[in-house]
């Protein structure tokens, strides 16, 4: 059952300007694994990656109905890519399943986060067939 949907749009250039002015922004927003993945990218692709993660975390806060800092911190949310490029969001101490979509067009990044409460059968299916159902 879907219990939350959040959307966010950011200007990639605006996020890049913040990163340039405030070097601590990346450390605040991105987890160590996300920072390592960002460091593997250069120029435009690095800016898209950072803006995408920032936007996705903002979308997550909208999907939950409370902002970052109230019940969850920036570092509690991690979005890494599977080998095929699909982003996967994991949230510390969060009992629900999350889905994230990140897309870039020109200077814009748009993200959507869906939060789902899984049934017992769905949870068992994930354990038995991890690649067939939703990812944990």
Swiss-Prot record:
Keyword annotations from UniProtKB, A to Z: Cytoplasm, Fatty acid biosynthesis, Fatty acid metabolism, Lipid biosynthesis, Lipid metabolism, Magnesium, Metal-binding, Transferase
Gene Ontology molecular-function annotations: holo-[acyl-carrier-protein] synthase activity; magnesium ion binding
GO BP term, pick one: fatty acid biosynthetic process
The protein's Enzyme Commission number: 2.7.8.7
Cofactor: Mg(2+)
Reactions catalysed according to its record: apo-[ACP] + CoA = holo-[ACP] + adenosine 3',5'-bisphosphate + H(+)
Localisation: Cytoplasm
Residues bound to Mg(2+): 8, 58
Principal place of residence: cytoplasm
GO cellular component, one term: cytoplasm
Superkingdom of the source species: Bacteria
Pfam families from the UniProt entry: ACPS
HAMAP family in the record: AcpS
Family: Belongs to the P-Pant transferase superfamily. AcpS family.
Function statement: Transfers the 4'-phosphopantetheine moiety from coenzyme A to a Ser of acyl-carrier-protein.
Name of the protein in its database record: Holo-[acyl-carrier-protein] synthase
Organism, scientific name: Leuconostoc mesenteroides subsp. mesenteroides (strain ATCC 8293 / DSM 20343 / BCRC 11652 / CCM 1803 / JCM 6124 / NCDO 523 / NBRC 100496 / NCIMB 8023 / NCTC 12954 / NRRL B-1118 / 37Y)
């Amino acid at each position: 059952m879907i219990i939350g949907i959040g959307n966010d749009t950011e200007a990639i250039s605006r996020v890049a300007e913040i990163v340039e002015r405030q070097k601590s922004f990346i450390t605040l927003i991105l987890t160590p694994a996300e920072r390592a993945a960002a460091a593997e990218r250069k120029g435009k692709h690095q800016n898209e990656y950072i803006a995408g993660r920032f936007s996705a975390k903002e979308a997550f806060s909208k999907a939950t109905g409370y902002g970052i800092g109230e019940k969850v911190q920036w570092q509690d949310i991690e979005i890494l890519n599977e080998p095929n490029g699909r982003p996967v969001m994991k949230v510390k101490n969060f009992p629900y399943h999350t889905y994230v979509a990140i897309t870039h067009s020109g200077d814009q990044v748009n993200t959507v986060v869906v939060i789902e409460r899984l049934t017992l059968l769905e949870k068992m299916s994930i354990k038995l067939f991890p690649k067939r159902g939703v990812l944990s």
